[in-house]
């Protein structure tokens, strides 16, 4: 077995919940999902995110393998609000005069995002489809050379259109 096969095997075991012991004191997925739902409902009430359409229940034929009893199958859209970023027109240099971090997929590092080299201003937020993502947002590169790269915001930031954000 080569290093890549070993890595893939370990990841597969982790996804199936077979890598570490499941402890009752850690709680269940159902409890975590209830907490996420309460927080999401509060964000909707505070008008920080929009209410999303309910997703269909997961059917038996969609389940690829068994998971621990304390886990739960769910759709990615159920864990948060997803949205793509935007790139303000470079024909408006005033959009880039400010101190609001603007992340591109090349800034994703599969870790925490604490520093972003490019910025936009309040005008860009007001006049374009840019959204300010809160601390804790999970970012993912959707296409291009960086597809699949991830990051978790440790600062509030906006993103370009090649990046989607999940606000848990």
Kindly label every feature range from the protein language model.
Residues 161-165:
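Glycine- and aromatic-enriched periplasmic loops at the membrane-periplasm interface
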Residues 2-63:
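Extended, domain-scale alpha-helical bundle/helix-rich regions
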Residues 147-153:
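Short, Lys/Arg- and Gly-enriched loop/turn segments at beta-strand edges
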């Amino acid at each position: 077995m080569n290093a890549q096969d070993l890595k893939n095997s370990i990841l597969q075991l982790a996804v199936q919940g077979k890598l570490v012991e499941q402890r009752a004191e850690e709680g269940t997925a159902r409890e975590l999902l209830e907490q996420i739902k309460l927080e999401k409902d509060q964000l909707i009430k505070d008008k920080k995110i929009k209410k999303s359409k309910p997703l269909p229940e997961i059917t038996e034929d969609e389940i690829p393998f068994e998971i621990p009893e304390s886990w739960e199958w769910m759709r990615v859209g159920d864990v948060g609000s997803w949205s793509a970023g935007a790139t303000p027109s470079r024909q408006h240099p005033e959009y880039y005069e400010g101190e609001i971090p603007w992340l591109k997929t090349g800034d994703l590092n599969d870790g925490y995002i604490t520093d972003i080299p490019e910025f936009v201003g309040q005008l860009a937020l007001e006049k374009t489809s840019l959204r300010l993502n809160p601390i804790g947002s999970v970012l993912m590169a959707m296409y291009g050379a960086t597809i699949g790269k991830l990051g978790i915001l440790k600062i509030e930031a906006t993103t370009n259109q090649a990046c989607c954000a999940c606000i848990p």
